Design a protein with these regions (language model features):
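Short beta-edge/loop segments at beta->alpha junctions of small alpha/beta modules
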Residues: 1-74
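Nucleic-acid-binding surface
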Residues: 59-193
């Protein structure tokens, strides 16, 4: 594959961020050394933007949520990012929050990415998880449950849009009595306010 054809394949994609493995698949390339050389050429000539080892963007205007989901896999966007996007909290933490298999903080292009550890049985369960615009994100109900599971005391501003039945139906995947209590307390508090 010529240099220009390889770049054109990337530029035609609806994705803005690519892992090295995704580029290999996109190009149908089996020679990793050759692919790495092409990618390095694109980076040196400013045609690809390096984000992190093995992760590249078309340019500096990449989708940050898409990048977030490629840093650690498996992971999904949740917690305060989803709560703020859905209007459940008014204070938005400027971090992009995800859950994954380890707790980490990462900074790239002046954007903080915060990863919170959650047990594998929850992380790999697809209930309330949505594939959206080249990234994976929790529904507002799943984000509420993740937050109640990970944080002992958390203040929510507006729970009017929550489907409580979905929350109670999904809560079993956490297998956690403290979460069950926090969910019930949060529901009771909302119901009587």
């Amino acid at each position: 594959m010529s240099h220009q054809k390889g770049l054109d394949t990337i530029l035609r994609s609806d994705k803005t961020v690519f892992s090295f493995r995704e580029i290999l698949i996109l190009w149908g390339e089996t020679n990793a050394k050759l692919a790495k050389a092409k990618i390095n050429y694109y980076v040196k000539t400013g045609q690809l933007y390096p984000l992190r080892k093995g992760i590249y963007a078309k340019d500096k205007n990449y989708e940050k949520l898409e990048f977030a989901g490629k840093i650690f896999k498996p992971s999904y966007i949740s917690l305060e990012t989803v709560l703020a996007l859905e209007g459940l909290i008014s204070h938005q933490n400027k971090n992009i929050s995800l859950v994954t298999y380890q707790t980490r903080h990462f900074l790239c292009d002046k954007q903080n990415y915060e990863f919170k550890k959650i047990k594998n049985s929850v992380l790999t369960n697809s209930l309330g998880i949505i594939q959206k615009n080249n990234y994976v994100i929790a529904s507002k109900e799943r984000a509420l449950l993740d937050t109640l599971y990970l944080y002992k005391d958390y203040h929510f501003d507006n729970l009017n849009s929550i489907d409580w039945e979905k929350c109670f139906d999904m809560s079993y995947i956490y297998k956690n009595k403290n979460l069950e209590k926090r969910l019930y307390t949060t529901y009771e508090s909302f119901k009587y306010n």
